[in-house]
A protein has these predicted regions:
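Nucleotide-activated chemistry modules centered on ATP-dependent adenylation/adenylyltransferase
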Residues: 2-360
């Protein structure tokens, strides 16, 4: 793929129409969010074109907020290795032409026995005694948005001192209208933070691009996509998972969950352990125990590949979760709304999106 990725495949709105209050050369820092999924690169490419058009490409950074072993891992099939989400985010950044030194990966940590170690979301859930759900999504705020803001705090402080004014940031997301009703209503451009340190404009330049257009664009550009999207690694048929978020996301649709349970049985069993010990179902519509049982029935999605989930990183997660479950839950469960529909909403609305009003 060429370093300067050209977007001539689809007619899109002119950049000026997409961002009437955002002047490309007045943005001090472009933050391009890459999850390893299909939508981030499509949005990032538009933002990169805008920055390049006015000669400020050096202000562009890509960032990936890693969820560790809860993300889709790398797999090797028939001697071919297919990268996991974190690795793929870095590959996407390079393919788009962003220098490696301007790609940032962040992951939440905490102190354990005098050293900083990864602090995974499932450990937090086990400690807390309940699962994320709409309106209470630590997977979005504490494991993504907060870390992303924090990663740029030192840069913002330095730039503010240099400029003598708040630093203008464009937080570029791959949110698209056809992912969910909530995302359809979400504006393509909005200001999420405005204080003495920074002004953050959340920009979703691929908001009106359809799912099929994203897939076609990805294939046409020769951009590698996450293997979880396919019926089996290397198929290139987009007949696997519909979304690439956490492997087992509480907001995923039922087919995606059944497919993930079959592809990552060891992770599913760990989720089921948390569910069983804390006595709280995975989400209001279904339990992980039920999903595991349904995934074993005839007619369940063919996994195409089954990951072993072996290695020190997963073992550390398992040990941390088991240790957390030996202690009382840190807070009482709250009452979650129970939707009547059998299928779950098909999107994790706002992953790494609504930035907290944090100062640098």
């Amino acid at each position: 793929m060429s370093r300067d990725l050209q977007l001539g495949l689809f007619p899109t709105e002119p950049v000026a129409d997409l961002m009437p209050d955002l002047v490309p050369d007045e943005v001090d820092i472009y933050i391009l969010n890459l999850s390893g999924g299909k939508d981030g690169p499509r949005a990032a490419a538009v933002a990169l074109d805008a920055a390049r058009a006015v000669g400020v490409e050096d202000r562009v950074y890509t960032i990936h907020a890693s969820l560790g072993p809860l993300e889709w891992p790398a797999v090797t099939v028939d001697g071919v290795r297919y990268p996991g989400s974190s690795e793929l985010a870095a590959l996407h950044s390079r393919a788009l032409g962003v220098p490696p030194e301007r790609h940032i990966e962040v992951r939440r940590t905490h102190e354990l026995q005098g050293e900083r170690v990864p602090y995974d979301l499932l450990t937090y859930i086990a400690e807390r005694g309940d699962w994320p759900w709409k309106g209470v999504l630590p997977c979005r705020s504490d494991w993504k948005t907060g870390l992303i803001y924090g990663a740029f705090s030192a840069m913002v402080r330095a730039r503010k001192k240099e400029l003598g004014r708040p630093v203008v940031c464009a937080n570029v997301l791959g949110i698209r209208a056809d992912e969910s009703p909530d995302r359809k209503k979400r504006p393509a451009l909005r200001t999420t933070t405005d204080n003495t340190f920074r002004v953050v404009h959340e920009w979703s330049p691929a908001h009106q691009v359809t799912t099929q257009e994203v897939k076609d664009w990805t294939d046409e550009q020769g951009l590698p996509h996450q293997w979880c999207y396919d019926s089996h690694p290397g198929a290139g048929d987009w007949k696997g998972s519909s979304r690439c978020s956490c492997s087992l996301c509480v907001l995923a649709n039922r087919r995606d969950l059944l497919l993930a349970v079959r592809r990552r049985p060891r992770l599913a069993e760990l989720y089921a352990l948390v569910e069983r010990v804390r006595g709280v179902p995975f989400n209001p519509n279904t339990s992980m125990a039920e999903l595991i049982e349904r995934a074993a029935r005839p007619g369940a999605p063919d996994p195409g590949v089954v990951t072993e989930d072996e290695g020190p990183e997963f073992d550390a997660l398992e040990n941390a979760v088991q240790a957390a479950l030996k202690k009382p839950a840190k807070r009482a469960r709250y009452v979650r709304p129970v939707p009547g529909a059998d299928a779950l909403p098909g999107s994790c609305d706002g992953c790494a999106s609504a930035g907290p009003d944090q100062e640098a």
